[in-house]
A protein has these predicted regions:
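Bacterial N-terminal signal peptides that target proteins for export
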Residues: 2-12
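Enrichment for repetitive, rod-forming helical segments
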Residues: 12-14, 152
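Alpha-helical transmembrane segments
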Residues: 15-19
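C-terminal motif of bacterial Sec signal peptides marking the signal peptidase cleavage site
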Residues: 20-24
Length: 166
């Protein structure tokens, strides 16, 4: 009887440990992005054809979750970027940042921000944020917000609908 209790206790402990391990392996994008998961983001320059991806498809890539703070005209802004990195997106299409001489992000309101390859030598982390922590992006930030640690907010582009690579 005593041996049986020990075995049951050991089994319960093993099952609890397995549950804890798998609980820590959940996707970093936990927010409900169903309101914009089917919005298309156009990608040019990663091949001969223009590519259309959705926020939902980007959510399925290897994603990160990072708290990032920057300065804006109104003061300090902190967001919890959740989504893939630019490098992950490029790797998905067989391209390296070394192959890129210029990246342009275009927002739905027409705002455009262009970066040359020299920028990415000092700013290696570029997050394609699909959510702000556990919350979906604000309407003007959807379907994608570019978050670049170590830069001011004018380099963060919200409402991205197009990415161009040269």
């Amino acid at each position: 009887m005593y041996i049986m209790k020990r075995r049951i206790t050991a089994l319960v402990l093993v099952l609890m440990a397995v549950c804890l391990v798998f609980a820590g392996c959940s996707k970093p994008v936990k927010a409900d992005i169903s309101g914009y998961e089917n919005e298309k983001i156009t990608i040019e320059g990663l091949g001969d054809e223009t590519i259309n991806v959705t926020a939902g498809e980007l959510k399925e890539l290897d994603c990160i979750r990072k708290s990032v703070t920057t300065q804006s005209k109104g003061g300090e802004i902190t967001v919890e970027a959740a989504g893939p990195t630019l490098e992950t997106l490029l790797e998905q299409h067989g391209v390296s940042m070394d192959d890129v001489s210029e990246v342009t992000f275009v927002a739905s309101d027409g705002y455009t921000k262009q970066f040359d390859s020299a920028f990415f030598t000092t700013h290696k982390d570029v997050y394609l944020s699909l959510a702000d922590g556990d919350d979906p992006l604000q309407e003007d930030e959807q379907p994608l917000r570019i978050v670049i640690p170590g830069t001011t907010s004018d380099n963060w582009v919200k409402g991205v609908v197009e990415m161009r690579f040269r």
